[in-house]
Amino acid sequence: MTDDEAVTAADSLARLLRETAAELDARHARDEALATVKASRKLLLVHTSASMQPAGRAWRLGVLLLDRDGRAWATGSITRATEPKREQNLSASVEERRDARRAASRRFTEGEVVNFGHVPLPLDAESLRSGAADPLLLRDGVVHVRWGQGADELRELRAYLADRSEFV
């Protein structure tokens, strides 16, 4: 693939993401909160809990998050802002999810869906060509999205976004 083809694909990608965001915004599609996680700290005898800080809003489109400006992220984890009713002392993963719900409930409206641990996607030509924009990749000059782990779980991004947009 030539440099010009990669640059053209990156330009087309940016335009597609902006168009998709504008269409979702015009439809008043339901978006979700984005958050960054501040890890818990222990200073001498004082222990602070992990917290979530609001970081914007985006639409969840399968393995991608898209904001109103056309920026994209690979999805991370998701929780709902609710105060857990009781500690159950189950497995570590259950307790981690409970802690995430509690952290989200401190900064977001009760019941709000909160995405955290998402990774910003570089959308430039070199990142697309090198595979650094995973789950986005360039095949034959067209941007595709890897929506699963299997080799056959690859789809042209335009069609993928059109399908996923219908569910938002």
Residue ranges and their predicted role:
Residues 12, 40, 49-51, 77, ...:
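Generic serine detector
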